[in-house]
């Protein structure tokens, strides 16, 4: 049994990681800003703190055998400084705390967005075949790229590191993406960008967690996966329109039937990016140029590097995942209403 710390253990993927690690017999502690009753139920210890506070992070990592660094500030828009503090400074604090406490293993949750390059497609490639993106105007992607580089550069004989890039995680327990999509669909405010024919990968939640456990089991100084990044998905690319509408159907929401052209959506995104900060409008920016590019571009990846280096094979197909989502959402009023 090991003592393992999960940053952001109260989130969607974080809870799946905590649940799986506890089931594997480990002592698990979550470091996050809030308090989550579900983690108490799982028997997970909780430490409240901010990743941007180096002393709090160093204290949390005392006596820890491995870290799953999953916490991040996500979202399509916001001040660069807020993303930099959470994603870059926070990650550097985790790395420094690993050094200070002699923690030998760090599994970092990254994102495929670090390779974003406008509308350039990524089709069937591994992470070592796709360079980091240029001009990452979205602060989330830009700061995650900086953080991932730092994590991989830190890999050495004392601290083994690996970065996983799960693509579009979905499934039961999602209290962010699917509920918002379903609400917009029911209100008639959801549009397809482009014709929706672009192939995209996605990752069922249990598969995303399993990839982390597989990497953890193989990670050690000098291991094949040490110091490397990997795309993670179900390995079942679907047209964007089909994926979105199958997810909506699973939560009893209407299909998307109307669309915006790329050019129109891109112009709207540019206007939103200008008006929201200028007028200090409340709420999240509804559309950005980065998001439009992501929605219209093929993004699907090779799982062969992850299979070869740490044995990752998706266990839950999209079809089975949708069935599980359908069963779960029928009991979850936040998604079905």
Swiss-Prot record:
Main location per the UniProt record: cytoplasm
Name of the protein in its database record: 2-alkyl-3-oxoalkanoate reductase
Organism expressing this protein natively: Xanthomonas campestris pv. campestris (strain ATCC 33913 / DSM 3586 / NCPPB 528 / LMG 568 / P 25)
Annotated InterPro entries: 2-alkyl-3-oxoalkanoate_rdct, 3Beta_OHSteriod_DH/Estase, Lipid_A_modif_metabolic_enz, NAD(P)-bd_dom_sf
Domain of life: Bacteria
Disulfide bonds: none
GO biological process terms, semicolon-separated: steroid biosynthetic process
Pfam families: 3Beta_HSD
Alphabetized Gene3D superfamilies for the sequence: NAD(P)-binding Rossmann-like Domain
Chain residues that bind NADP(+): 144
Assigned keywords, A-Z: Cytoplasm, NADP, Oxidoreductase
Lineage, top ranks: Bacteria, Pseudomonadati, Pseudomonadota, Gammaproteobacteria, Lysobacterales
EC number: 1.1.1.412
Quaternary structure and interacting proteins, as annotated: Forms multimers. Forms a complex with OleB and OleC.
Alphabetized GO MF terms: oxidoreductase activity, acting on the CH-OH group of donors, NAD or NADP as acceptor
GO cellular component terms listed in the entry, alphabetical order: cytoplasm
Similarity comment: family membership: Belongs to the 3-beta-HSD family.
Residues the record marks as active site: 140
Subcellular location: Cytoplasm
Purpose of the protein: Involved in olefin biosynthesis. Catalyzes the reversible stereospecific NADPH-dependent reduction of 2-alkyl-3-oxoalkanoic acids to 2-alkyl-3-hydroxyalkanoic acids.
First-level EC class: oxidoreductase
Catalytic activity: a (2R,3S)-2-alkyl-3-hydroxyalkanoate + NADP(+) = an (R)-2-alkyl-3-oxoalkanoate + NADPH + H(+)
Gene name tied to this protein: oleD
Signal peptide: none
């Amino acid at each position: 049994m090991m003592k393992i710390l999960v940053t952001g253990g109260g989130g969607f993927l974080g809870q799946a990681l905590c649940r799986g690690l506890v089931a594997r017999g480990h002592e698990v502690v979550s470091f996050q800003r809030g308090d989550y009753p579900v983690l108490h139920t799982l028997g997970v210890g909780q430490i409240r703190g901010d990743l941007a506070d180096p002393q709090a992070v160093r204290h949390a990592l005392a006596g820890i055998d491995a870290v799953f660094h999953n916490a991040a500030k996500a979202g399509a828009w916001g001040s660069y400084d807020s993303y930099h503090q959470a994603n870059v400074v926070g990650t550097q604090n985790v790395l420094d705390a690993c050094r200070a406490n002699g923690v030998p293993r760090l599994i970092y949750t990254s994102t495929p967005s670090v390779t974003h390059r406008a509308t350039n497609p990524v089709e069937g490639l591994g992470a070592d075949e796709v360079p980091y993106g240029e001009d990452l105007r979205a602060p989330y992607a830009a700061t995650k790229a900086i953080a991932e580089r730092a994590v991989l550069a830190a890999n050495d004989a004392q601290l083994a590191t690996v970065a996983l890039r799960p693509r579009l995680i979905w499934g039961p327990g999602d209290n962010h993406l699917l509920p918002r999509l379903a609400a917009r669909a029911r209100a008639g405010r959801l549009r397809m960008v482009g014709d929706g024919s672009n192939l995209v990968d996605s990752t069922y939640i249990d598969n995303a967690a399993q990839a982390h456990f597989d990497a953890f089991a193989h990670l050690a100084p000098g291991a094949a996966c040490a110091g490397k990044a990997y795309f993670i998905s179900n390995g079942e690319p679907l047209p964007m329109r089909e994926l979105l509408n199958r997810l909506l159907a699973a939560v009893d929401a209407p299909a998307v039937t109307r669309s915006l052209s790329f050019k129109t959506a891109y112009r709207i995104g540019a206007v939103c990016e200008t008006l929201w900060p200028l007028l200090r409008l409340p709420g999240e920016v509804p559309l950005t140029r980065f998001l439009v590019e992501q929605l219209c571009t093929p993004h699907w990846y090779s799982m062969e590097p992850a299979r070869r280096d740490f044995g990752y094979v998706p266990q839950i197909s999209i079809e089975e995942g949708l069935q599980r989502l359908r069963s779960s959402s029928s009991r979850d009023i936040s998604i079905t209403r």
